[in-house]
């Protein structure tokens, strides 16, 4: 019995030791690793790429022989340092451009072969985007950079151009605008990164700031531009006012003409009705009709009481009868 107990204890010790050794090997050499949804891994053997993994789950490697490096599979953010750049065109104004970008690893094999680490990736992105920004910005006038349409900038606040758009037609007509310029920067930057497995997804001009030496002159120029636009709007308003007043006068004359025509028509109808009534009255009592007509004539003739007439006239036969 004692022999059996000792044998069992020895077996338990051996099993325990084996488990501890296995766990130690697993913790040191890590032949198993977990790949997350937003990650991609590359496995190398003696510096050569063996395989890549982009599906989440448990993954395996050969300890001491294979190495695994994990990289993000998501779109990443890049923030550049503000750059002092002269604009294109005739103005050649110095401005500060602050840009941000989004990028991703498009080809893990190229990325690992040429760069290998994320820190070096950001260095290469700096070298790809910043020259592209300088080159593109230097080709265009300031208004092309800060506008995305022909609507003018409404205000300048603390030296920062705010792309707040209005409905007033500006004097300068842009041909491309900020959005197209950003796309041009993306295209050039991608040409610079296509050999290293990086894709520049988007580049945004986050802020455009005038150089301090130019703020006063730019303020004066923008005031002058606003005054020109205001004068243009006043001219448009006066033209519209003249047109509206002309329409009102035309409508008034039309209404008056129609009213006069209607009044003449009504008067004619009234005259006809009066003539009809007079005719009926004349037919019924001729003497009374003559008397009534005489009274109406007296009203018209004798308005001025200072007139002197002879009563011997037949006209006054109803006022004075001879004996």
Curated annotation (Swiss-Prot):
It comes from the Bacteria. Its main location: membrane. Keywords: Membrane, Transmembrane, Transmembrane helix. GO terms for cellular component: membrane. It is found in: Membrane. The chain crosses the membrane at residues 14-34. It is a single-pass membrane protein. HflC and HflK could regulate a protease. Belongs to the band 7/mec-2 family. HflC subfamily. HflC and HflK may interact to form a multimeric complex. This is Protein HflC. It comes from Borreliella burgdorferi (strain ATCC 35210 / DSM 4680 / CIP 102532 / B31) (Borrelia burgdorferi). The gene is hflC.
């Amino acid at each position: 019995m004692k022999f059996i107990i000792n044998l069992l204890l020895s077996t338990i010790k051996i099993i325990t030791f084996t488990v501890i050794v296995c766990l130690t090997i697993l913790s040191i050499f890590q032949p198993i690793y977990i790949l997350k949804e937003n990650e991609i891994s590359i496995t190398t053997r003696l510096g050569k790429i063996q395989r890549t993994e982009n599906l989440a789950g448990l993954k395996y490697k050969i300890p001491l022989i294979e190495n695994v490096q994990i990289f993000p599979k998501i779109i990443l953010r890049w923030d550049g340092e503000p750059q002092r750049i002269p604009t294109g065109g005739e103005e050649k104004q110095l401005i500060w451009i602050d840009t941000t970008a989004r990028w991703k690893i498009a080809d893990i094999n190229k990325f690992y072969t040429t760069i290998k680490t994320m820190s070096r990736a950001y260095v290469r992105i700096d070298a790809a985007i910043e020259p592209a920004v300088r080159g593109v910005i230097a080709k265009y006038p300031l208004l092309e950079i800060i506008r995305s349409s022909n609507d003018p900038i409404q205000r300048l606040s603390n030296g920062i151009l705010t792309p707040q758009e209005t409905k007033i037609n500006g004097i300068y007509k842009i041909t491309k605008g900020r959005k197209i310029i950003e796309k041009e920067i993306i295209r050039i930057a991608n040409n610079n990164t296509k050999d290293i497995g990086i894709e520049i997804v988007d580049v945004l001009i986050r802020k455009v700031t005038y150089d301090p030496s130019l703020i006063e002159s730019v303020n004066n120029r923008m005031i002058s531009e606003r005054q020109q636009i205001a004068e243009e709007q006043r001219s448009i308003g006066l033209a519209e006012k003249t047109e509206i007043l002309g329409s009102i006068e035309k409508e008034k004359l039309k209404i008056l003409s129609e009213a006069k025509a209607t009044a003449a028509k009504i008067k004619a109808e009234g005259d006809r009705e009066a003539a009809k009534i007079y005719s009926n009255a004349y037919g019924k009592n001729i003497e009374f009709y003559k008397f009534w007509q005489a009274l109406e004539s007296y009203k018209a003739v004798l308005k001025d009481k200072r007139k002197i007439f002879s009563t011997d006239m037949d006209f006054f036969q109803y006022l004075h009868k001879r004996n």
